[in-house]
Amino acid sequence: DSFLEANLMNFGIGLGVIPILGALLGLLHLQIVWWLFLLLALIMPIYDLFNYILKSGLIKSNFVKSNGDSNDVVNEINLKGIFNKIFGKIKFGELLKIKKSTIYVLLMLIMFICLFFVMNKGAFLNPWLENGDSWGHVGHIKYMELHKTYYTPGETQLTNYGIPYPPGYDILMTILFQISQSSYWALKFFNALLVSLATIFFYFFAKEFTNDKKIALFATLILTIIPSFLSHFIWSKTLAILLYFPALYCILRSEQNKKWLIPSIIIVASILITAPVTAFYLAPFLGILWLGKLIATKKLNLNIIYAALGGLVLSLLFWGDMFIRYTFKGVLIILNIVKVKGGTDATLTKLLHVHGTGATKYKFMDFIWVNTYNMINNPKGIGLVLSILVLFAVISFIYLFIYPFVSKYIQKYSKKDSKEDFKEDVK
């Protein structure tokens, strides 16, 4: 269980490192190429491996007398000892035993496989890309694949997803383009894979949050079957939303070990340079998490605040450069976060006038009922059954938590008032 969790979440954390690392390479005017990411990823494992071999005495130095007066040093590597050190402690019989906790992980992986099958099949049913969002991304990714950078000559914006639009999603896809024979296949396949990976990362976040594998598995099932969570539509929000779960997982782990703040900050920064709108959504998520923890533990839980502020500062590796190049107001205008009226006044549009999927306004039934057809980018609604479960959950929450609190509050002050009335009557 812990072995699977460690390796699967390492994969999620690694995904969260790529966008901000790519932004750093771009800022330093280094090429965004797959082998450089691989080299940087192997530095620490290779260092740890050699450090382990040296400390364990698996490399022995022998002094051999040469023909001259001096001695030559010959290093002998004990390959048999290395093999025994690595594999000697592994009890292969125990590996075949499946623990109860491992069954939950395997069930979650079945959900992942099913979701990936659906998303991958749907992505390749059409021989073309969906709409302008997909073509905008593929145009910018192709430019980055050829020129190894997200910077364009002057202030030219080749597509609507060129800078100052955050390049996190395109950085990841550029690396995958470079190692794939077909750009078309890479974009569709890996985008569907990103959507499906949310199942894995959400399960471990939910397990960490609830400290209950059964609740985590049920919550993962609900997320997997919700039609409106994510689709195979190609846009940067897919990666940004996916990274929420590794970020929240690391933030929760930082309560036990402060070292987890490092990946927390890195992943939060990557979210902030992947999709502008989704970056704004992150603040309420972290705020709700902080408030819930405050109520439950009566502690400030500063780790959540540190992760948010640290990620914001680290994201300035990209945003700071963009604000210098285009000015703060210019970036907001280009990203259509503000709208210019009369050439001078800028008023907030996207943040104050929130629309639903496909820029349409949601009606009440859009949240409950799921149509047999989708919008061009994402389905609507959570379904009738889940809506009933949500209603039941809200009623249960009010009955179990809100009602006792209010009742206790009323009784406390009603007794206080009755005592004061009694004293006045006595007087």
Question: Model-found features: residue ranges?
Answer:
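Membrane-interface transmembrane helices that cradle and orient dolichyl/undecaprenyl
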Residues: 208, 244-261, 271
